[in-house]
UniProtKB/Swiss-Prot annotation:
SUPFAM superfamilies: S-adenosyl-L-methionine-dependent methyltransferases (SSF53335). The gene is DAM. This is DNA adenine methylase. S-adenosyl-L-methionine binds at Y7, K11, F32, C33, G34, G35, L36, S37, D50, H156, F157, D171, Y181. It catalyses: a 2'-deoxyadenosine in DNA + S-adenosyl-L-methionine = an N(6)-methyl-2'-deoxyadenosine in DNA + S-adenosyl-L-homocysteine + H(+). Belongs to the N(4)/N(6)-methyltransferase family.
């Protein structure tokens, strides 16, 4: 079950098990949609939200972009696994223009396919000695075949309007892990999210949360205590890639918490 892009911690390997716990719904709300590995692979209609506006704008642009358009940019910049200077030129041009198509092409050539955006909105991922492959076009085609059911938004999770009949799926940054995209997530943000989920439960709205209770010796005591009010399913998975190449293969208690 492919996403639109490679994305740290994506749920494509876990999704079959997760979907077995999803309820019936009028609309699927993916509150932290990331690489779309969930949004693209559930029944619509879907609201795919992520606070990272450049990524959401990239998805919106991709709806009207052909694969030939992607190849034209790669040819124009003479990009390959060894074209570091050409990659840096493309990165410079994206940071000047904020053209979402350039961001999409950049991510194929950046380190671990990561999209790092700094506080100024600039793409900062270094060259990754990589380029497109067969899976790149496969992901693109999967996106194009499944994007019609999706409405995109780039709001803070507290600002998304949740309707009666929605099912709200959340896969937030994890408080106790060290991935790059978790660095702006604080205990206050965690509390705000848990309070939001409690309020949804009070309204009779179904939710499900992917998270980790323990990771490499750390414990999310806040989440563990909160989860006692709900159903907790313990999961086992292997991430698509581990950018920190941790030698610890065990010690992560990944869970799905739902009402």
């Amino acid at each position: 079950m492919l996403g639109a892009i490679a994305y740290t911690g994506n749920k494509q390997s876990l999704l079959p098990e997760l979907k077995s716990h999803f309820p019936k719904y009028n609309r699927f709300v993916d509150l932290f949609c990331g690489g779309l590995s969930v949004s693209l692979n559930v029944n619509g209609p879907v609201l795919a939200n992520d606070i990272q506006e450049p990524i959401i704008e990239m998805y919106k642009r991709l709806i009207n972009v052909s694969w030939d358009d992607v190849l034209k940019v790669i040819k124009q910049y003479k990009l390959s696994k060894t074209s570091k200077e050409e990659f840096l030129k493309l990165r410079e041009d994206y940071n000047k223009t904020r053209d979402p198509l350039l961001l999409y092409v950049l991510h194929f050539h950046g380190f671990s396919n990561m999209i790092r955006i700094n506080d100024k909105g600039n793409f900062t991922t270094p060259f990754g000695k990589r380029t497109i492959n067969k899976n790149s076009e496969k992901q693109y085609n999967h996106f194009k075949q499944n994007c019609d059911k999706i409405i995109f938004s780039s709001l803070h999770f507290k600002d998304v309007k949740i309707l009666d009949g929605d099912f709200v799926y959340v896969d937030p940054p994890y408080l106790i892990t060290v991935a790059d995209y978790n660095k702006f997530w604080s205990e206050d943000e965690e509390k705000d999210l848990l309070n939001l989920l409690d309020s949804l439960n009070d309204r009779g709205i179904k939710f499900g949360q992917s998270n980790v209770l323990e990771h490499h010796g750390k414990e999310n005591t806040l989440l563990k205590e909160w989860s006692k009010k709900y159903n907790v399913k313990h999961l086992n998975k292997k991430y698509v890639f581990n950018i920190y190449h941790s030698k610890e293969k065990n010690g992560t208690d990944e869970v799905y918490i739902f009402n």
